[in-house]
């Protein structure tokens, strides 16, 4: 069973709202208030509301059950695909049933020098295991447990760091501080069980009541979770109408039932929806789509000889603006997306690709949430997992299992359901899919796309070795299918009448190499095939058919959207590209340094204008002029220019280091003396504290 965090009310709540008469004339409904932990007197520790995942969906919650760490072991060897160890637990474990135990695992691999290095996502965070492990207990001493963990794919020299955990209790009764309830408001309530009842016959009752201005209490919710409803790992939703408005209202929440089961009952952050003032200009919706691993030069709108993206060409490039020269900051999923969501270069983050709860960097979802947007995300897990910090700011963060055969299909279907459920609200929707990612799987209907004969024609000079051309063909087929998936989603946006009121952004986190510079995949190089990403934008005030050639970065997406929405800027390193849109003119500012990095020994690089520098500790520096050599095949031999570019890189690195140090120091200051030791143990168990 998983324990993480977030919101699943959109479909149920949206249908309830429509059924109750919330028609299109209420198109300016916004989130007027979120009743977070502080409204209920709860200590949030690091400053952000706790997030709890039930099943595939995570939501911010008022109070989460603490995770008790019963045992913590490091250096457990893996032999023949199996890790096994025995530990003596405390006396409280004697009476705990087997299904009350949880297991969290972290992989660590040792290199010859003896240093520990990260091994995939599980090296960054503990990963709670839902299966592939067993707990053995002798009848005469149930507190002495043996754990077996299946690790058939573990790399050589990998050991495990393991925690045996149990879920503690959440508060059973909560009462909010007074708040104002606007006329015609609606409450969105989410509730669920952090784990199924230990007793199959167990049940929990959830009750919500509202008391306003001294009037009699109004019961908003009185539901029991038992049987199949209690065993199902999912959130439950309600959208009650609170009745009369009030100047001073209190929301009272209660969970009751068997002692153990009631302790696992949790409430998502309640939200109050109300109409936006009529005299305030309406805010636009935002849809942000990330097609993981999509390099820009494989889209036909970017000049690729194959028609890989005819639908996006027509629906986005022709109806909006295409940014020709955009780069990521780190060609890996987590760091690239974190730059997208924070507007910060990868080198400025204390841990690239990971946002701790106390690090004072604002995410796009947090900025839009604070502006009254309903926020939802549908991802395909893996390196975009919520535990890395991506779920902060989202009212709903859904992680679908990464299944190659269904990549994209479920994600865009979820996105379409979100649109239908929230068409009368201001929303921010983030969709992420690995559809284009290796192993480049596409449906049989696309088998005839990407003719191998193209390698003797339009693709002859692409620099791809013959042994990699079949991979490129498969990659292009996956892009072509992703193109149709995006188009079907955009058609639903049109059908619902939302297209003219919604900014749509399609981009990626990084590209993909096919041997052009001796590398395959991504993450381990700084050449354009890994860094150059698409950026397509359409919506109000965005010129149709526009093209912007000014070099830009993935960090510019956040400030651009806030600028277009008329929202105040946040402290980010990116800059708004709105000036390149209005009047279809280019940004007039002087070229700015655009730093980036990749996996390598002191690997770092910088783009300044058309000049690009790649530097590592174990290789001579490489200097290119992308204006005359876009494929980076002719390194420049120009000592003066190299010295200048090294100075630019040093300046960019100093700026990143200053921000990184400030963020880390602020995070430590916010952390220190705030969270109790038990909270810190829970954060360690969830992977937030190493």
Model-derived features: positions:
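Hydrophobic h-region of N-terminal signal peptides that target proteins for export
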Residues: 10-21, 683
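Short, flexible helical or helix-coil boundary motifs
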Residues: 14, 109-112, 656, 690
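Bacterial N-terminal signal peptides that target proteins for export
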Residues: 2-11
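Glycan-recognition and processing domains
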Residues: 24-180, 197-200
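N-terminal regions of proteins, emphasizing targeting and processing segments when present
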Residues: 16-17, 109, 123, 490
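Intrinsically disordered and other compositionally biased segments
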Residues: 6, 17, 297-299
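Catalytic domains that recognize anionic headgroups
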Residues: 21-66, 166-201, 205-207, 211-690
């Amino acid at each position: 069973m998983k324990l993480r965090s977030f919101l699943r009310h959109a479909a149920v709540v949206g249908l309830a709202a429509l059924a109750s008469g919330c028609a299109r004339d209420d198109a300016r409904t916004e989130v007027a208030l979120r009743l977070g932990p502080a409204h209920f007197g709860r200590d949030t520790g690091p400053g952000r509301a706790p997030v709890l995942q039930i099943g595939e969906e995570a939501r911010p919650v008022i109070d989460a059950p603490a995770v008790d760490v019963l045992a913590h072991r490091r250096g457990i060897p893996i032999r023949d695909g199996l890790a096994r160890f025995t530990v003596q637990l405390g006396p409280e474990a004697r009476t705990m049933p087997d299904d009350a135990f949880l297991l969290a695992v972290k992989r660590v691999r040792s290199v010859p020098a003896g240093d520990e290095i990260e091994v995939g996502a599980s090296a960054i965070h503990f990963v709670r295991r839902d299966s592939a492990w067993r707990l053995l207990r002798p009848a005469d001493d149930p507190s002495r447990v043996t754990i077996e963990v299946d690790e058939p794919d573990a790399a050589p020299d990998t050991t495990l760091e393991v925690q045996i955990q149990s879920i503690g209790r959440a508060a059973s009764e909560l009462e909010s501080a007074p708040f104002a309830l606007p006329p015609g408001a609606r409450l969105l309530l989410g509730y669920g069980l952090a784990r199924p009842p230990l007793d199959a016959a167990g049940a929990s009752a959830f009750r919500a009541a509202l008391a306003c201005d001294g009037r009699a209490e109004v019961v908003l919710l009185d539901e029991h979770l038992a049987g199949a409803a209690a065993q199902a790992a999912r959130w439950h939703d309600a959208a009650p109408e609170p009745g009369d408005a009030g100047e001073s209202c209190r929301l009272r929440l209660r969970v009751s039932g068997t002692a153990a089961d009631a302790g696992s009952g949790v409430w998502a952050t309640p939200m109050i929806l109300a109409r936006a003032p009529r005299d305030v200009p309406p805010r636009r919706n935002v849809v942000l789509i990330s097609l993981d691993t999509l390099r820009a030069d494989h889209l036909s709108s970017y000049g690729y000889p194959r028609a890989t993206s005819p639908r996006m060409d027509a629906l986005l490039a022709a109806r909006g603006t295409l940014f020709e020269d955009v780069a990521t900051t780190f060609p890996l999923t987590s760091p690239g997306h974190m730059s997208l969501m924070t507007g910060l270069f990868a080198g400025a983050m204390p841990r690239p690709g990971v946002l701790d709860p106390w690090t004072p960097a604002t995410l796009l979802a947090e900025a839009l949430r604070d502006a009254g947007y309903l926020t939802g995300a549908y991802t395909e897990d893996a390196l975009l997992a919520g535990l890395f910090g991506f779920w902060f700011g989202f009212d709903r963060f859904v992680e679908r299992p990464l299944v190659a055969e269904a990549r994209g299909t479920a994600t865009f279907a979820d996105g379409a359901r979100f649109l239908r459920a929230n068409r009368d609200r201001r929303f921010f929707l983030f969709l992420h899919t690995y559809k284009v990612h290796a192993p480049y799987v596409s449906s049989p209907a696309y088998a005839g796309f990407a003719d191998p004969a193209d390698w003797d024609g339009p693709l002859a000079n692409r620099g791809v070795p013959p042994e990699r051309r079949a991979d490129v063909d498969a990659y292009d087929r996956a892009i072509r299918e992703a193109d149709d998936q995006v188009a079907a989603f955009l058609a639903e946006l049109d059908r619902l009448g939302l297209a003219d009121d919604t900014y749509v952004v399609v981009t990626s986190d990084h590209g993909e190499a096919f041997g052009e510079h001796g590398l395959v995949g991504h993450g381990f190089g700084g050449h354009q095939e890994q860094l150059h990403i698409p950026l397509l934008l359409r919506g109000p005030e965005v010129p149709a058919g526009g093209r912007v050639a000014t070099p830009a970065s993935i960090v510019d997406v956040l400030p651009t959207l806030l600028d277009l929405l008329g929202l105040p800027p946040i402290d980010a390193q990116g800059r708004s590209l709105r000036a390149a849109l209005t009047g279809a003119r280019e940004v007039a500012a002087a070229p700015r340094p655009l730093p980036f990095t990749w996996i390598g020994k002191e690997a770092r690089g910088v783009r300044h204008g058309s000049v690009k520098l790649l530097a590592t500790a174990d290789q001579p520096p490489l200097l290119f002029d992308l204006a005359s050599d876009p494929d980076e095949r002719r390194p420049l031999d120009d000592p003066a220019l190299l010295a200048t570019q090294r100075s630019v890189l040093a300046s960019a690195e100093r700026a990143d280091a200053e921000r990184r140090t400030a963020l880390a120091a602020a995070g430590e200051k916010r952390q220190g003396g705030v969270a109790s030791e038990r909270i810190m143990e829970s954060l360690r168990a969830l992977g937030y504290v190493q």
